[in-house]
């Protein structure tokens, strides 16, 4: 569910592959179900559910599938108790990495996460070791839109900031609680985001060289391949020059 921002060039690189897409759908359904179970089926009063639904629709999940996941979560009848865990660690070049998991078995999950870090030249950290480098925000990404009109509509709806990227795409940032309100207002104004999600935004970035870039990509891929992992956030960036050497 990466957006168009400058660090998104190395997030979820395999998202276009069919197998990866299937896993994304499975994880998104799990998030929707859990959000509905914990906060109720009304997205208007449940920001976590609203964000999950928006993210699911942005990757072309059908509304019917979304509604079934909400109904299952609200009913709470699947007998599986899942908890959300966040692990923090360090990747190559000291990159900060946060791993959001949803699991019914902590021991299995932490073992898989630790293995991914150790196999990729990283290390699992302690609680709070890198979390301070990230801020939780809603992101609405638009490939193309009238910048002035979008900015006016977004700020009027309560967005925190609007940024135009080098490629012409536009990112609208919100607080997590205002995400649904801003999304609804922009869609009502005719602006449909290409991607919409609540993410962890790094306050600082680490530029990776040609040696460390593939190591971070390996770490991300290994983590995302774990069934219990929902999201991977990091502050690594790869320049166009270095990216060209990885093709």
Swiss-Prot record:
Gene3D superfamilies: 1.10.10.200, 3.30.70.980. InterPro entries: Integrase-like_N (IPR017856), TACO1_YebC-like_2nd/3rd_dom (IPR048300), TACO1_YebC_N (IPR049083), Transcrip_reg_TACO1-like (IPR002876), Transcrip_reg_TACO1-like_dom3 (IPR026564), YebC-like (IPR029072). It comes from the Bacteria. It is found in: Cytoplasm. Disulfide bonds: none annotated. GO terms for biological process: regulation of DNA-templated transcription. The keyword Transcription applies. PANTHER family: TRANSCRIPTIONAL REGULATORY PROTEIN YEBC-RELATED, TRANSLATIONAL ACTIVATOR OF CYTOCHROME C OXIDASE 1. Belongs to the TACO1 family. This is Probable transcriptional regulatory protein Tola_2714. The lineage of its organism: Bacteria, Pseudomonadati, Pseudomonadota, Gammaproteobacteria, Aeromonadales.
């Amino acid at each position: 569910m990466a957006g168009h921002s400058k660090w998104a060039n190395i997030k979820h690189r395999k998202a276009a592959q069919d197998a990866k897409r299937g896993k994304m759908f499975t994880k998104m359904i799990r998030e929707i179900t859990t959000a509905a179970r914990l906060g109720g089926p009304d997205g208007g009063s449940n920001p976590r559910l609203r964000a999950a639904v928006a993210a699911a629709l942005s990757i072309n999940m059908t509304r019917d599938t979304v509604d079934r996941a909400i109904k299952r979560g609200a009913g709470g009848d699947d007998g599986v108790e899942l908890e959300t865990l966040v692990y923090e660690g360090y990747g190559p070049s000291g990159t900060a990495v946060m791993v959001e998991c949803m699991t019914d078995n902590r021991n299995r999950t932490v073992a898989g996460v630790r293995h991914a870090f150790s196999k990729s030249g990283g290390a699992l950290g302690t609680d709070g070791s890198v979390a301070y480098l990230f801020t939780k925000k809603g992101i609405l990404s638009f490939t193309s839109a009238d910048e002035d009109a979008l900015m006016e509509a977004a700020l009027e709806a309560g967005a925190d900031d609007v940024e135009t990227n080098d490629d012409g795409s536009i990112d609208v940032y919100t607080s997590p609680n205002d995400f649904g309100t801003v999304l609804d207002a922009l869609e009502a104004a005719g602006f449909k985001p290409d991607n919409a999600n609540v993410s962890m935004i790094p306050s600082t970035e680490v530029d990776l060289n040609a040696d460390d870039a593939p190591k971070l990509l390996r770490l991300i891929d290994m983590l995302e391949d774990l069934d219990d992992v929902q999201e991977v956030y990091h502050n690594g960036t790869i320049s166009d020059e270095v990216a060209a050497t990885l093709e």
